[in-house]
């Protein structure tokens, strides 16, 4: 230990974050070190600009949507705990977690929470539905100008037609889950964090 990261995180904070996110002590310490290196203002929070300096997010077509997921509504800064809560959605599900206490809170990295997180990336206006326009905006972010507007419109129309079960021309969370029921979301939405 003895690093700057370990001295600035109190043991009780470390335990609370471990319990809430499922990360190990060493993972939390390592991620705290990364957090402080990103904190250019050295004020214990990250801004959107701090995130935009991360090369992997800067080149990701959904980078802005992912960055926005770190910030609570109306906030322009995120503290370490909020940072860890968002990252926890991407923590792989370990074998020993599959038989967790059914009465306890659902882990942030559960299939359901990963699906909610993904759904929110598409639900731009936060009305609990993915409209054709929202789908078009996200598709445009992902493919850039490589596909014509007409082709994108066809993809969006077909996607909504296949997913929309109640005929409202939008995709609800329930319909989103149904479409992805055979997709290994747990694996596809996981990042390996060093121990």
Swiss-Prot record:
All copies of domain EF-hand, residue ranges: 26-61, 66-101, 110-145, 151-186
Cited InterPro entries: Calcineurin_B_homologous, EF-hand-dom_pair, EF_Hand_1_Ca_BS, EF_hand_dom
Residue positions binding Ca(2+) 1: 123, 125, 127, 129, 134
Swiss-Prot/TrEMBL keywords: Calcium, Cell membrane, Cytoplasm, Cytoskeleton, Endoplasmic reticulum, Lipoprotein, Membrane, Metal-binding, Myristate, Nucleus, Phosphoprotein, Protein kinase inhibitor, Protein transport, Repeat, Transport
Motif Nuclear export signal 2 per UniProt: ranges: 176-185
PROSITE patterns, sorted: EF_HAND_1 (PS00018), EF_HAND_2 (PS50222)
Mode of membrane association: Lipid-anchor
GO biological process terms on file: cellular response to acidic pH; cytoplasmic microtubule organization; membrane docking; membrane fusion; membrane organization; microtubule bundle formation; negative regulation of calcineurin-NFAT signaling cascade; negative regulation of NF-kappaB transcription factor activity
Position of sequence motif Necessary for association with microtubule and interaction with GAPDH: 2-6
SUPFAM superfamilies documented for this protein: EF-hand
Main localization category: nucleus
General function of this protein: Calcium-binding protein involved in different processes such as regulation of vesicular trafficking, plasma membrane Na(+)/H(+) exchanger and gene transcription. Involved in the constitutive exocytic membrane traffic. Mediates the association between microtubules and membrane-bound organelles of the endoplasmic reticulum and Golgi apparatus and is also required for the targeting and fusion of transcytotic vesicles (TCV) with the plasma membrane. Functions as an integral cofactor in cell pH regulation by controlling plasma membrane-type Na(+)/H(+) exchange activity.
Family the UniProt entry places it in: Belongs to the calcineurin regulatory subunit family. CHP subfamily.
Protein name, as recorded: Calcineurin B homologous protein 1
């Amino acid at each position: 230990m003895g690093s700057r990261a370990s001295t600035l995180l109190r043991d009780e904070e470390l335990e609370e974050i471990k319990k809430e996110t499922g990360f190990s002590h060493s993972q939390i310490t390592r991620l705290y070190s990364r957090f402080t290196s990103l904190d250019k203002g050295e004020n214990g929070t990250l801004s959107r600009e701090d995130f935009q300096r991360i090369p992997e997010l800067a080149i990701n077509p959904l980078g802005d949507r992912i960055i926005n997921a770190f910030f609570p509504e109306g906030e322009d800064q995120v503290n370490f705990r909020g940072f860890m809560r968002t990252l926890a959605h991407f923590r792989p599900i370990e074998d020993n977690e599959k038989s967790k206490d059914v009465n306890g809170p659902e882990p942030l990295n559960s299939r359901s929470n990963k699906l909610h997180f993904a759904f929110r990336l598409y639900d731009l206006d936060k009305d609990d539905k993915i409209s054709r326009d929202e789908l078009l905006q996200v598709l445009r972010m992902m493919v850039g100008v490589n596909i014509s507007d007409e082709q994108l419109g066809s993809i969006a129309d077909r996607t909504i037609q296949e997913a929309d079960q109640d005929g409202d021309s939008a995709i609800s969370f329930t319909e989103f889950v149904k479409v992805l029921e055979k997709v290994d979301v747990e694996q596809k939405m996981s990042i390996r964090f060093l121990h």
